[in-house]
């Protein structure tokens, strides 16, 4: 006679398997690997962020420099960006004096782009002791993000200093022209009047750049120099600049 056992009695009881865990050596090695990775990440991350920041600033400087040169060459602020970006302008003279145009609270100068270009195009005097030496401006980045152009973000926006020097191109040293005749000298003078050299030095970043207290301002160690030549004549006329009569200059590339 066959006897059937109940199902609960017929089930096989599983045997208890062997338990295993990490040893202290394995745990220590894992912690060491994680710690090494964290140290490597934290050590490289600041360098990577700094490189990214430097690349971004250099990209902005290259784009802004090209725009400024084109504005001076054409005599026109085509995009109308300068009037909202420049907040300090100083014309330095060779005798040590200067003319300063500023606005309160580092606000943009209340000048239209055309007058701004005319002031930036002020030529450097070729005389020894008198005349203009250079033009210095402080400005916020033209090709930065949109949030940097907001009025509330002026203190954190990328800012830099630009020094402009424009002078007639001296292609012939005086010692080579002293023995020339009148016609040849006139031809050389006419050539020099039709060709100008532009040297623009941009330095960044700016620190303590309070426009009403320019003596406290400090400039960083980064710098980029742009050099170009402009062929044509330079037109100038007096105009009203914030209540003062000043000369503004404009290049006309098509006229000689």
Per-region residue spans from a language model:
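N-terminal leader/signal peptides at the extreme start of proteins
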Residues: 1-22
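Flexible, low-complexity segments enriched in proline/glycine/serine and punctuated by aromatic residues
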Residues: 3, 22, 29-32, 45-53, ...
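Sec-dependent, cleavable N-terminal signal peptides
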Residues: 7, 42-43
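Generic hydrophobic-segment detector
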Residues: 11, 20, 25-30, 38
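Active-site-adjacent bridging/hinge elements
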Residues: 35-42
């Amino acid at each position: 006679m066959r006897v059937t056992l109940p199902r609960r009695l017929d089930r096989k009881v599983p045997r208890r398997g062997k338990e295993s865990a990490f040893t202290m050596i394995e745990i220590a090695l894992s912690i060491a690997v994680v710690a090494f990775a964290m140290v490597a990440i934290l050590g490289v991350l600041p360098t990577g962020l700094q490189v990214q920041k430097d690349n971004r600033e250099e990209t902005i400087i290259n784009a802004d420099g090209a725009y400024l040169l084109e504005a001076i060459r054409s005599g026109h602020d085509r995009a109308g960006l300068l009037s909202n970006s420049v907040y300090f302008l100083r014309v330095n003279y060779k005798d040590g004096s200067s003319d300063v145009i500023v606005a309160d609270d580092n606000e943009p100068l209340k000048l239209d782009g055309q007058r701004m270009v005319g002031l930036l195009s002020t030529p450097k005097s070729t005389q020894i002791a008198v005349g203009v030496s250079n033009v210095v401006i402080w400005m916020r980045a033209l090709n930065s993000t949109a949030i940097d152009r907001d009025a509330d973000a002026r203190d954190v926006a990328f800012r830099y200093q630009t020094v402009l020097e424009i002078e007639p191109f001296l292609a012939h040293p005086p010692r080579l022209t002293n023995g020339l005749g009148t016609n040849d000298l006139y031809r050389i003078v006419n050539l020099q009047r039709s060709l100008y050299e532009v040297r623009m030095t941009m330095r960044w970043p700016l620190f303590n750049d309070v426009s009403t207290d320019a003596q406290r301002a400090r400039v960083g160690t980064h710098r980029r120099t742009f050099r170009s030549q402009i062929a044509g004549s330079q037109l100038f006329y007096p105009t009203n600049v914030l209540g003062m009569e000043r000369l503004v200059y404009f290049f006309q590339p098509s006229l000689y």
